[in-house]
């Protein structure tokens, strides 16, 4: 069975949709859409009708490219008021004594049972390690022999309204949300490596109007916070200083400015029309000074937030989000954070831009989740193959659906 997934990132500035296939453990882009959004502020839906218009446009673009109908998606949810709690569970293994993917699902279900509050929604549960009889620190228990299977896991939850509002938007379009995840976890899935998986790391996503700072310990999320500042504030600064409208300011930021004035050129000049209809000349140095000033503030606030989230030494920091694409960004972040920081670098053909880190990471995350449970699944069955012994067939009342929230309905 081909493993084809559709992921959606509902951002304040744009909606990103990715259809990709996992083949030989690599993500291959089949289609991608990026359209301007409206109806979302600070990462939260404020006008359902407006977001529906943008979402329809993005979906139609994907469907037109692939000549298919999108009816299932994975969606990112905002990190506002997310909580992370360590939970444990244990189940007995059947008479054969061989642990299966179903046993993994059962023990995770046991771990979260009765621990979810009424106003909270389970976003995901991430195994820290499994226990087979008396043996701890097992990463993959499948096919091992034992009488009992235990797990220590991190349960991530968010206010129910954060998830319900997103699901209802898709349902109104006849689309099922089969899985959700925090954008910060998706970002980590995109950029994780041996260094990040062995120590304390941070992911900083500079979005349009918010910046999300998340901490991970050996690949497991432990804390997250949202700062009310982002790329939009840079646009506002450019607009104020040069008396330009916001749209022109954004274009100049993305296509002309650099993140560090050290790498700007005084003789590189762009002409622009002000809100007073005056024609002015702007040097790359002048606009980059404005950009660098606000970027420095954002990065310093993010750095301060990492100290508030943990007192442990952070060994690895990843900067992502569309704003991270500005030329010279690596030099600026190293000045502020030191040598243990890197700007994200997506090398997948078709999505080589940090604004796609969340949609790409969502797909990598669900594929890892399914493999750990010994399941196969596709959202778009191009081969029309209904066979497959381990293909998921799950209804709303199933154990798996209860464990992972709105997971599968096929």
Report the location of each language-model feature:
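Short, charged, surface-exposed secondary-structure boundary motifs
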Residues: 42, 190, 236-237, 349-356
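Acidic, glycine-rich loop-and-beta core segments that form the ion-binding/anion-interacting portion
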Residues: 193-261, 265
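Glycine-rich phosphate-binding loops at beta-strand->alpha-helix junctions
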Residues: 13, 259-260, 313-333
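Nucleotide/phosphate-binding catalytic cleft detector across ATP-hydrolyzing
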Residues: 1-14, 18-201, 245-246, 251, ...
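Short glycine-rich phosphate-binding loop at a beta-alpha junction
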Residues: 68-79, 309-323
């Amino acid at each position: 069975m081909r493993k084809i997934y559709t992921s959606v990132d509902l951002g304040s500035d744009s909606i990103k949709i990715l259809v990709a296939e996992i083949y030989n453990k690599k993500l291959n882009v089949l289609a991608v859409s990026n359209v301007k959004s409206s109806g979302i502020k600070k990462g939260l839906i404020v006008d359902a009708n407006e977001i529906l218009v943008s979402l329809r446009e993005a979906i139609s673009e994907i469907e037109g490219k692939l000549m298919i109908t999108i009816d299932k998606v994975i969606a990112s949810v905002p990190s506002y008021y997310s909580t992370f709690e360590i939970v444990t569970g244990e189940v007995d293994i059947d008479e054969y004594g061989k642990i299966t993917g179903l046993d993994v699902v059962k023990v995770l279900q046991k771990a979260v049972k009765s621990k979810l509050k009424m106003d909270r929604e389970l976003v995901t549960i991430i195994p820290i390690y499994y226990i087979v009889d008396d043996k701890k620190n097992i990463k993959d228990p499948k096919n091992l022999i034992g009488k009992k299977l235990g797990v220590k896991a991190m349960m991530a939850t968010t206010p129910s309204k954060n998830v319900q509002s997103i699901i209802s938007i898709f349902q109104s379009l006849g689309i099922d949300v089969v899985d959700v995840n925090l954008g910060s976890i998706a970002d980590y899935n995109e950029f994780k490596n041996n260094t990040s998986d062995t120590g304390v790391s941070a992911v900083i996503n500079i979005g349009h109007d918010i910046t999300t700072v998340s901490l991970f310990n050996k690949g497991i999320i432990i804390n997250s916070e949202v700062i009310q500042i982002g790329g939009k504030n840079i646009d506002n600064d450019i607009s104020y200083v040069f008396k330009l409208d916001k749209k022109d300011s954004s274009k100049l930021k993305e296509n002309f400015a650099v993140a560090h004035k050290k790498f700007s050129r005084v003789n590189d000049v762009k002409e622009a029309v002000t809100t007073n209809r005056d024609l002015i000349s702007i040097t790359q140095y002048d606009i980059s000074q404005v950009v660098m000033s606000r970027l420095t503030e954002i990065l310093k606030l993010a750095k301060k937030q990492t100290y508030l989230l943990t007192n442990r030494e952070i060994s690895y920091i990843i900067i992502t989000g569309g704003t991270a694409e500005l030329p010279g960004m690596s030099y600026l972040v190293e000045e502020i954070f030191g040598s243990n920081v890197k700007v994200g670098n997506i090398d997948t053909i078709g999505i080589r831009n940090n604004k796609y880190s969340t949609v790409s990471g969502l797909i990598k995350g669900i594929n890892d989740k399914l493999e750990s449970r010994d399941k196969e699944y596709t959202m778009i069955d191009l081969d029309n193959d209904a066979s497959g012994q381990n293909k998921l067939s799950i209804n709303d009342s199933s154990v798996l659906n209860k464990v992972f929230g709105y997971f599968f309905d096929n």
